[in-house]
Swiss-Prot record:
Catalyzes the reversible phosphorylation of UMP to UDP. Allosterically activated by GTP. Inhibited by UTP. Signal peptide: none annotated. Residues 18-23 are annotated as: Involved in allosteric activation by GTP. InterPro entries: AceGlu_kinase-like_sf (IPR036393), Asp/Glu/Uridylate_kinase (IPR001048), Uridylate_kinase (IPR011817), Uridylate_kinase_bac (IPR015963). GO terms for cellular component: cytosol. Pfam families: AA_kinase. It is found in: Cytoplasm. GO terms for biological process: 'de novo' CTP biosynthetic process; UDP biosynthetic process. This is Uridylate kinase. It catalyses: UMP + ATP = UDP + ADP. Belongs to the UMP kinase family. The gene is pyrH. Homohexamer. It comes from Campylobacter jejuni subsp. doylei (strain ATCC BAA-1458 / RM4099 / 269.97).
Length: 239
């Protein structure tokens, strides 16, 4: 019997907003649900981390000086809970079993994060959506994604974004930007390479956890990647 794969998919909050740039676009929720459903159909265990940038970012909230960075980050954590509940609804409407687990206790809305409980949910075929970041300010949701992936013993992290993968410089600004299909953890931490923040990449490196960056709007892309086709994405791993 083939061993079941376990993955953690990281979605940016901005992606949920679509062309609006703010809030949650129902059509994108439906698309995400259909993509995740294909993974579950193929006996893949799925955890999800979602950002909160479509509602508020802690760094941005603190820029004016009125709101402290810690308070801004707390607001950002709450934004991820809003997004997690939205994704839960979309997944459940598609026929999947889902649990939201928050790093901050809020029993009226969702479970509190417990590593072993999350693992049991995954083993039973439920999708687990991890909300409220790490529960601590100054840590990004990218770092949350790596941390939760390590804790649940995921085979890889897939960062589903609005671009095809990683370039040596910003392709929107430079026509000669080169697409990087494979790169090392150390290369991913270079200033001109924007994969994740250094804390997230260092944690992935320490645990030999592959990071795949792909276009979330490419239909069937997530399943292809997990099945071994990384031709349309970038992968960060040991050389």
């Amino acid at each position: 019997m083939q061993e079941r794969k376990r993955v953690l998919v990281k979605f940016s909050g901005e992606a949920l907003a679509g062309e609006n740039g703010f809030g949650i676009e129902n059509s994108i929720l439906k698309f995400i649900a259909s993509e995740i459903k294909e993974l579950i159909k193929n006996q893949i265990e799925v955890g999800i981390v979602i950002g909160g940038g479509n509602i508020i970012r802690g760094v941005s909230a603190a820029k004016g000086g009125l709101i402290k960075r810690t308070s801004g980050d707390h607001m950002g954590m709450l934004a991820t809970v809003i997004n997690a509940i939205a994704i839960q609804e979309a997944l459940e409407r598609s026929g999947l079993e889902v649990r939201v687990q928050s790093a901050i206790q809020m029993e009226a809305f969702c479970e509190t994060y417990i590593m072993r409980r999350a693992q049991r949910h995954l083993e039973k075929g439920r999708v687990v959506v991890f909300a409220a970041g790490t529960g601590n300010p100054y840590f990004t949701t990218d770092t949350t994604a790596i941390l939760r992936a390590v804790e649940i013993d995921a085979d890889m992290v897939i960062k589903a974004t609005k671009v095809n993968g990683v370039y040596d410089k910003d392709p929107k600004q430079f026509d000669d930007a080169v697409f990087l299909n494979t790169l090392s953890y150390d290369e991913a931490m270079q200033d001109n390479i924007k994969v994740m923040d250094d804390t997230a990449i260092a944690l992935a490196k320490d645990n030999k956890l592959p990071i795949v960056v792909c276009n979330m709007f490419e239909e069937g892309n997530l399943l292809k990647i997990i099945q071994g086709d990384t031709s349309l994405c970038s992968i960060v791993k040991n050389n």
